[in-house]
Curated annotation (Swiss-Prot):
Domain of life of the organism encoding this protein: Bacteria
Record keywords: Cell inner membrane, Cell membrane, GTP-binding, Hydrolase, Membrane, Nucleotide-binding, Protein biosynthesis
Record gene name: lepA
Top-rank EC class of the record's enzyme: hydrolase
Record-given protein name: Elongation factor 4
Transport in keyword set: no
Biological function: Required for accurate and efficient protein synthesis under certain stress conditions. May act as a fidelity factor of the translation reaction, by catalyzing a one-codon backward translocation of tRNAs on improperly translocated ribosomes. Back-translocation proceeds from a post-translocation (POST) complex to a pre-translocation (PRE) complex, thus giving elongation factor G a second chance to translocate the tRNAs correctly. Binds to ribosomes in a GTP-dependent manner.
Membrane topology label: Peripheral membrane protein
Species the sequence originates in: Chlorobium phaeobacteroides (strain BS1)
Listed GO CC annotations: plasma membrane
Binding locations of GTP: D21, H22, G23, K24, S25, T26, N138, K139, I140, D141
Amino acid sequence: MSSSTTVVDTIRNFCIIAHIDHGKSTLADRFLEATDTLLHNQATAQVLDDMDLERERGITIKSHAIQMRYTSADGEEYILNLIDTPGHVDFSYEVSRSLAACEGALLVVDATQGVEAQTIANLYLAVEAGLEILPVINKIDLPSSDVEGVSQQIIDLMGVDRSEILEVSAKAGIGVDALLEAIIKRVPAPVDQRSKPLRALIFDSVFDAYRGAIVYLRIVDGMLNKGDRVRFFANEKVFLADEIGTMGLKRQPVKTLGAGDVGYLICSIKDVRDAKVGDTVTLADAPAKERLSGYKDVKPMVFSGLYPVNSNEFEDLRESLEKLSLNDASLVYTPETSAALGFGFRCGFLGLLHMEIIQERLEREYQVNIITTVPNVEYRVISSEGGTHVVDNPSKMPDAGFIEKIEEPYVSVQIITLAEYIGNIMKLAMERRGEYKNTDYLDTTRVNLHFEFPLAEIVFDFHDKLKSVSKGYASMDYEYIGYRDSDLVKLDVLLNGESVDALSTIVHRSKAYEWGRRLCQKLKSIIPRQMYEVAIQAAIGSRVIARETISAMRKNVLAKCYGGDISRKRKLLEKQKEGKKRMKQVGRVEIPQEAFLAVLNMDDQ
């Protein structure tokens, strides 16, 4: 077992920030090969993206870290700690904590795509964290690349000199060695603060079935030794450091980690929620006085009900969610029941991508078939008595008579697109109650549009719509800015006078009629005909605002009456009518699963 007491001057902690698909994980693979951490014949594409789902979607979901040893041109051996960060807006808190563990960042921009919205958002996070930023243009070998145009965008954005921009092709391995040399020259070494009390920043944690939660941390001050008693600031819990070490492709145990090192800590933590991202670890016997700044509890922004297709799979769903939440501390869930769907869970997610990933992992890794209800945001309802209720499920909304006002969360959105699509995007924004703020021109063809939106309007399918109105050229990023008053109403769906709780939604009053009408039409096309007439109504409180009727299937009871008396026929028709009436009183309309999914894709009409 080696001791990791390296000289701080030879350590470089850096991360790669980029928009989705700009080649971040591929560049990380080239680093691993260039530093002989990974032999070419071992390589699987995107080594750091170890979830199947991460490779398939081409995104990084969890933060990862790896240590490489590199001998530079001057003959000195350096330790490079690469902290790979998620690039998606849903995981921006994880990104900010990963950045806090570094001294430098590579800002990777695709030579064919240029600067995108998340590139800018992550750049701002890196600037806030005070990092040395190295601009890198990737994919320079592609025929469609525009290196000079993209360089100009970076110069306008960051104010750097053209000579500071590095050019690479991660796929072909061009320029990788020059980039490694630039990291050593330009990224500062950590400050040597080994004599201070221990403070270490947690930037990720994963769950291992045998070892418990494995905590990834960056030592900021002091030293951590194997066998030390450590304390977590967020919950004051004390654990024994059973094993500490650094992270190559596999974990490498060491006896000591000092300030500037990035490593892992195993201390028999049963629940990953005890090791929160952004928390500070210190020694229980000689604690630091205050935690590192920047920690916050991550709150879910989007809520949705998950129900098993088969009600007898409820326990399987519970177990699957428990296992998933061991590895994902930002997933929140509570049991709930619905008259239409039975037993299920109300789950809170960081955003839409997070929600999709959880659903896909449930179905793929745990083979649980689920129905998802319409995603909602958390509304604040101020009652006429002055109390405040938080509502994340339309069925929990109090009666209109008790409501003084309703507030909903707003987000600040930046959309980067080509100038020719401004009109389309403005139109889409107005449809979604967006409030235009201002426009920045990035260059002669690309613009950055700033809006403020209610979160509920973009949580649904806004991203898909944005891509279609801009022919795929727009990218977006959003940031939460707080609650505002809104004129919102609860829209109920009634089938033969009975409310179906799973189809209720909260909508803006100006959109209620249109939404109700389209929902009724959609349900009419999906719910099968019954032996009796079915009335589908959309209502706000007791006021019905839209209605569709599914006509009854009827048997021709007069088929066997050849000629004969009219009163005989009338008697048979009356008898049929009575039967239908009775059937309608006792019959319940079976709602097919597609009806719940119909609400999710209302715009496909």
